[in-house]
C-alpha cells in the first residue's frame, strides 16, 4: 500500500517538474529555473522510497538515498526565494525593493548555513516501516528491521522546513487577501497540517510537499499570465 502511495507521489512530483519546466520555457522566469532543482529531488526522493522493496537494503539503495538528504539540506528552503519572487510578480510594490528581496534571500542562506553541518554529522540507517524498505536519518522502535537492531540517529527540530512553510503561508495570505488567489496559502497550510504526527504517520507529509509546491507553481503560472496591477502594502 505505502509503496504504491510513494509511487503516486513520485508521479505527481514529476508532473509538477514538467509543468515548472514548461513555465520556465514559456516565461523565462528565473525563479522557475531555480525551483527546478529542489523539484527534481522531490521526484527522486519519492521514487527512491517507492523502489526500496524492489532493491532491498544494500549499497545501491544506500547511495540512491543520500542525494535526497543532500538536496533537502541544501535546497529545501529555496521556496522562500520563490515566495518573494511571486509577490513581485503579483504586483506588490514593497516586494520590488532590493532590500525586501534581499531579506528573502538572506533568510534562505541562513537556513542553508544552519543545515550545513548535517553534511558531515548526519548518517542514514536501514529502516523497515509498513511495506517500505528504505534508509532514514534515524531508527526508532517502530522502524527497526529486526528486534535487536540498535536505535540510532536523532530527530532534530526541522527549522528550515518549518520556516519555509510559514513564509510561503505568509506570502500566500497576502496573495489571497489582496489578489484573491488562495492556493499558495492553502498549499502551505496543508503541508503544515500533513507534517503533524496524526498525518505524518501515514506518510501524508509527502502529499503535503506536492500541495505546497503545486500552490507555488500555480501562483507563478497565474501571475505571469495576468496583468498584475500594482498592489500597495
Regions found by a protein language model. Name each.
Residues 83-164:
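Membrane-proximal helix-loop-helix units in multi-pass membrane proteins
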Residues 15-24, 44, 48-60, 70-104, ...:
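Internal transmembrane alpha-helix with an interfacial aromatic "cap," most often the third helix
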Residues 1-16:
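Hydrophobic transmembrane alpha-helical segments in integral membrane proteins
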Residues 40-48, 107-117, 186-200:
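Aromatic-anchored segments of alpha-helical transmembrane domains
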Residues 25, 49-59, 115-125, 193-200:
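Juxtamembrane "helix-exit" motif on the non-cytosolic side of transmembrane helices
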Residues 164-233:
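C-terminal transmembrane-bundle signature of multipass membrane proteins
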Residues 27-41, 96-104, 176-187, 228-232:
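Membrane-interfacial loop-to-transmembrane alpha-helix junctions, especially the N-terminal start
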Residues 58-70, 131, 203-211:
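Non-cytosolic membrane-interface motifs at loop->transmembrane helix junctions
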Amino acid at each position: 500500500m505505502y509503496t504504491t502511495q510513494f509511487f503516486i507521489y513520485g508521479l505527481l512530483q514529476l508532473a509538477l517538474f514538467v509543468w515548472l519546466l514548461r513555465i520556465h520555457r514559456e516565461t523565462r522566469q528565473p525563479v522557475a529555473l531555480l525551483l527546478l532543482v529542489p523539484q527534481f529531488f522531490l521526484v527522486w526522493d519519492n521514487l527512491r522510497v517507492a523502489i526500496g522493496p524492489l532493491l532491498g537494503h544494500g549499497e545501491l539503495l544506500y547511495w540512491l538515498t543520500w542525494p535526497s538528504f543532500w538536496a533537502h539540506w541544501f535546497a529545501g528552503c529555496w521556496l522562500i526565494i520563490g515566495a518573494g519572487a511571486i509577490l513581485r510578480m503579483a504586483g506588490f510594490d514593497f516586494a520590488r525593493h532590493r532590500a525586501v528581496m534581499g531579506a528573502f534571500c538572506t533568510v534562505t542562506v541562513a537556513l542553508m548555513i544552519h543545515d550545513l553541518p548535517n553534511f558531515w554529522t548526519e548518517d542514514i540507517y536501514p529502516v523497515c516501516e509498513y511495506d517500505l524498505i528504505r534508509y532514514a536519518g534515524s531508527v526508532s522502535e517502530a522502524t527497526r528491521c529486526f528486534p535487536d537492531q540498535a536505535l540510532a540517529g536523532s530527530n532534530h527540530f526541522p527549522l528550515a522546513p518549518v520556516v519555509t512553510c510559514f513564509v510561503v503561508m505568509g506570502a500566500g495570505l497576502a496573495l489571497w487577501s489582496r489578489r484573491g488567489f488562495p492556493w499558495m496559502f492553502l498549499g502551505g497550510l496543508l503541508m503544515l497540517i500533513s507534517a503533524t504526527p496524526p498525518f505524518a504517520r501515514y506518510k501524508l507529509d509527502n502529499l503535503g510537499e506536492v500541495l505546497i509546491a503545486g500552490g507555488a507553481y500555480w501562483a507563478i503560472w497565474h501571475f505571469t499570465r495576468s496583468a498584475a496591477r500594482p498592489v500597495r502594502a
